[in-house]
Each structure stands twice: as structure tokens, then as C-alpha cells.
């Protein structure tokens, strides 16, 4: 009898430990870094690098999607963020030419299962491809991760839509809505990025109210936590501290998660900003 009670207690303890691990939330950030080639004077990359990294460290993300990363910045990320592994390639040549939409994930928590990239074009597998009215080549990078403690797997994708192409942005949403379900294969999924659109744009509707068969119905974490749309939701600041306006930077999740926190991080230091975009953050709980 004593042995039976011991086994029951042990099983209960193990079950509680598993539940505790499974309930650990995901801290997610999306951050457009502002590319280092831009002639930004006092806001140039070398003058804000330290502030940029301290801003990230303050949130302690488990997962982070970057946009506009050039080679010198990618080298800085990998050198400075040693607790993270990175996935993604530069968009122009699939190696180091052009901007990355790379992903960082905490090495102590996640193991990479698979990774890849596709281009937001009519030929998604063609490196450096560009279509429609897009001004620039655009890419979506993804990584399939396994949570070490629980064995849970999920897909995380990160992207940056074109800043000029109206048709290209809507078609980019369609490419993502077609490709990511194939890659996810019914796994839970996350999508972050600078989409260069607001919630009124048809490209946004393609993601959150999909009509494409099999598409993931993406949930906007910020709107989930803050259901009433406000006037001070700008996520682009132009190094001027702008707050009025709409978000163009997003953290989406599939139905496997629920957002318990979501914010636009408007950290400043002596009227300086870590980038011309505010980082956006979310805390996601497994359902």
C-alpha cells in the first residue's frame, strides 16, 4: 500500500511538472532595425547600436523576428546575442547580399528541427525573385522549433512586405497563406513582420479572415489584448517619437495560442530611439 501511494504521488508530481513546463509562455518580439546603410546622421546604426541591444535585453524575448538587417548588422546580432541561434538568409542572393528578415530563438529553450526561406513573388522558390509592383525583393524566413522541456513543436515565420507595391503586399499575404500551412503541417504557428500596412488594408484581411482553402487564420496579438482601436498605435516613429497612427508591425499567432500581453515598446533615451520603428512585443500562452 505504501509503495502504491508513493507511485501515485510520483506520477502526480511528474504530471504537475509537465503541466508547468507546458504552461511556460512565449515572449515574442518583432523589430525593424533600420538598415545600416541609411544616412541617418545622429540616428545612424553605429550611434544607436548599444541602445538597440539594451532594448532587446530589457524584454528578454524567447523569439525575435528582425527586418531590414544588413550583413554588418547580422554579424552584430550573432556576436552580441550569444544566447540565441539564428535562422534566415539575405534576400538578394540567399546568402549575405541584401536585407535579412532573420529569426533569433533562445538556444537554451528551443531546438531547431528545420528551417527555410521563400520569396514573396510568383516564383517563391527562386532566390531573389520579385513580382507584381514590388519595388524590392522580399523574403519570408521560417524555422520549425521544438521546445526542449516539453517536446512541443511549432513553426515561426518572419517577413517584411514591400513599402510601395500595393498589389505586391496583397499578393505577399496570399503567398504566405498558401506556403506556411504546407510547411506547418497543422503545427501551431507564429508570424511576425513589418507588413507596411494597417488593419484596413486588404492584405491584412487575407491573413486574419482567410478565404484561401487551408490557410491559417492568423490572430493579431495586439488587437486580441487591446480590442478597442486607439489613435496612438503607430509602430513607425521615423526617429521622431511619433505615436499617432496605426501599426504596421505585427505579431500573429494561430489558434494554438492566446495572447496575454502585447505592447508597442516606446523606450527612449535622451530623445533618441533604438530604431525608426518601435519594437512590438507579445506574451503568448499555449492553449
Where are the regions that the model predicts?
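Sec-dependent signal peptide recognition
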Residues: 4-13
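Hydrophobic h-region of N-terminal signal peptides that target proteins for export
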Residues: 12-21
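N-terminal, active-site-proximal structural segment of metallo-dependent hydrolase catalytic domains
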Residues: 21-80, 93-99, 174, 287
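Active-site metal-binding loops of divalent metal-dependent hydrolases
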Residues: 31-33, 159-161, 194-195, 278
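Short, solvent-exposed loop/turn elements at domain surfaces
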Residues: 35-42, 66, 113, 166, ...
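Structured beta-strand-rich core segments of catalytic domains in phosphoester-bond hydrolases
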Residues: 63-157
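Metal-dependent phosphoester-hydrolase catalytic domains
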Residues: 109, 144, 167, 171, ...
Amino acid at each position: 500500500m505504501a509503495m502504491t501511494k508513493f507511485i501515485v504521488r510520483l506520477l502526480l508530481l511528474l504530471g504537475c511538472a509537465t503541466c508547468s513546463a507546458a504552461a511556460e509562455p512565449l515572449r515574442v518580439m518583432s523589430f525593424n532595425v533600420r538598415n545600416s546603410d541609411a544616412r541617418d546622421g545622429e540616428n545612424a546604426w553605429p550611434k544607436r547600436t548599444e541602445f538597440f541591444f539594451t532594448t532587446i535585453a530589457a524584454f528578454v524575448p524567447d523569439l525575435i523576428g528582425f527586418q531590414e538587417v544588413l550583413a554588418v548588422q547580422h554579424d552584430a546580432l550573432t556576436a552580441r546575442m550569444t544566447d540565441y541561434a539564428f535562422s534566415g538568409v539575405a534576400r538578394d542572393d540567399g546568402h549575405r547580399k541584401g536585407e535579412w528578415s532573420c529569426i533569433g530563438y533562445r538556444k537554451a529553450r528551443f531546438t531547431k528541427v528545420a528551417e527555410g526561406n521563400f520569396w514573396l513573388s510568383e516564383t517563391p522558390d527562386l532566390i531573389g525573385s520579385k513580382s507584381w509592383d514590388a519595388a524590392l525583393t522580399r523574403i519570408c524566413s521560417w524555422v520549425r522549433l521544438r521546445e526542449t522541456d516539453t517536446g512541443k513543436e511549432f513553426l515561426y515565420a518572419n517577413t517584411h512586405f514591400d513599402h510601395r507595391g500595393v498589389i505586391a503586399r496583397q499578393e505577399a499575404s496570399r503567398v504566405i497563406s498558401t506556403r506556411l500551412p504546407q510547411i506547418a503541417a497543422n503545427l501551431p504557428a507564429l508570424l511576425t513582420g513589418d507588413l507596411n500596412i494597417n488593419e484596413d488594408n486588404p492584405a491584412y484581411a487575407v491573413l486574419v479572415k482567410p478565404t484561401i482553402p487551408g490557410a491559417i487564420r492568423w490572430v493579431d496579438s495586439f488587437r486580441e489584448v487591446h480590442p478597442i482601436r486607439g489613435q496612438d498605435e503607430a509602430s513607425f516613429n521615423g526617429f521622431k517619437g511619433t505615436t499617432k497612427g496605426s501599426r504596421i508591425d505585427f505579431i500573429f499567432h494561430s489558434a494554438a495560442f492566446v495572447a496575454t500581453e502585447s505592447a508597442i515598446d516606446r523606450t527612449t533615451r535622451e530623445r533618441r530611439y533604438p530604431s525608426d520603428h518601435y519594437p512590438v512585443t507579445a506574451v503568448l500562452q499555449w492553449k
